[in-house]
Amino acid sequence: MRKIKFFDTTLRDGEQSAGVNLNLQEKLEIARQLERLRVDIIEAGFPASSKGDFEAVKQIAETVRTCSVTGLSRSVRSDIDAAWEALKGGAEPRLHLFIATSPIHMVHKLRMTPEQVIEAAVEAVKYAKRFFPIVQWSAEDACRSELPFLAKIVAEVIKAGASVINIPDTVGYITPKEYGEIFLYLQNNVPNIENVSLSAHCHDDLGMAVVNSLSAIEHGATQVECTINGIGERAGNAALEEIAVALHIRKDYYQVETRLNLQEIKRTSNLVSKLTGVVVPPNKAVVGKNAFAHESGIHQDGVLKEKTTYEIISPELVGVPSNSMVLGKHSGRHALRNRVEELGYTLSDEEINQLFVRFKELADKKKDITDDDLIALIFEEKFDHFKDFYQLSSIQVQYGTNQIPTAVVVLKDGKGNEIQEAATGAGSVEALYNTLERCFQTPVTLLDYRIESVGGGRDALAQVFVKVRAHDIETSGRGTAQDVLEASAKAYINAINRVFMIEAMRGENEKVATP
């Protein structure tokens, strides 16, 4: 049975989603979870694009041991050199090279002739092979390329040493039948193509990324590139969880196998959603909250009698928990640490100690602490602190039906200086955000505001997600507290801290368009 490798690009292509800006700690946590999911390859970033990306790729390569870590590179030596410096400490360093091959890209973007493109691709592969044991080569915008030229350049890069050939549908243009035919054409027209692995990379602009990826697998691809929850630029990428479960449930049809641990899918989906702020639609296949819900009376009756009447995927297959452990104010540090590890999170002794303090504070106000509560506390403790930027000291909001909402906020900056401001607004949240904007002394545009309850009950934690734009940077933030307004303030501060973090970490190089 053929083995299909999963190449996860959540940390590279997925992070190109509008408003998604992950910090180093968040990227490392996602990489560790992808390792638990047992993906074959993690594309950790684009090392030459910025200092922040370089450092993230380097640390992920040095941390992950049971799967290969790769980075993206243009077909230029400086990019390849940067990628090698970032990836050389990995368990299996590999490089992902790309260059555009469609007429529209060669003429208008590269301004190169087809012969020049072939020469650049071959030279880049040969140079990369001096360092990397595995070189993957991608034909950007392959699906709008002329097939004879595509076959010619693929043949040349194979001769130069590429061992993986990726055929990206960069703009989500292709149909399943056409995509499969490209793979067949290459297999029939490229010498020695049987000695390399063929890879699929699909975008979802026409809603066909997953089915196109499956078509590629049917027609000879042995690697598929995808992201968790299908996040990515524009309409997103092919969703890893949908492809993986389709291959498992319909193994009779596809006749392939993977090394994925499917029981880690739901946990991975939740982690990526929380850290990126990208909501998983309720009706999303495999990981949506309604994926296993049955509303129809006839369906409910059938499922109660025999699950397989209306349920082709069991919740347990993808790690949807049937119950959760409840902790309380009498639970000790050891029980807390054990549960944190069972939930799949890695915390240092210092982080556990700080989490235990927050846990006890919440346990004094809330009788039962569920897994959802604990995860919210972990996120706040592990990912939402920016010690070098603003931290909330206190808020006070006055509101009444016949009063103008007024907020008073006290913040501390990275140097420990105290900042106090007050402002009014049409509502409590606006008053709060107007006050915070005065503290930051910078104009901020609120693009989105969303509030969720963590679990049920009147004593549930509130979790607020915001998306903002400041200094021409669009980013998201999150905050958790029992009080809605405190959670709202934390989310806004978290988002602004990310803006300042991005500005501080920006290198001289700007982000580059990629496949």
Curated annotation (Swiss-Prot):
Which InterPro entries does the protein's record reference? 2-IPM_HCS-like, 2-isopropylmalate_synth_dimer, AIPM/Hcit_synth_CS, Aldolase_TIM, LeuA/HCS_post-cat, LeuA_allosteric_dom_sf, LeuA_bact_synth, PYR_CT
The biological pathway it contributes to is: Amino-acid biosynthesis; L-leucine biosynthesis; L-leucine from 3-methyl-2-oxobutanoate: step 1/4
Q: Does the keyword Methyltransferase apply?
A: no
Which Gene3D superfamilies is this protein grouped with? 1.10.238.260, 3.30.160.270, Aldolase class I (3.20.20.70)
Gene Ontology biological-process entries: L-leucine biosynthetic process
GO cellular component annotations, sorted alphabetically? cytoplasm
Q: What is this protein called?
A: 2-isopropylmalate synthase
Corresponding gene? leuA
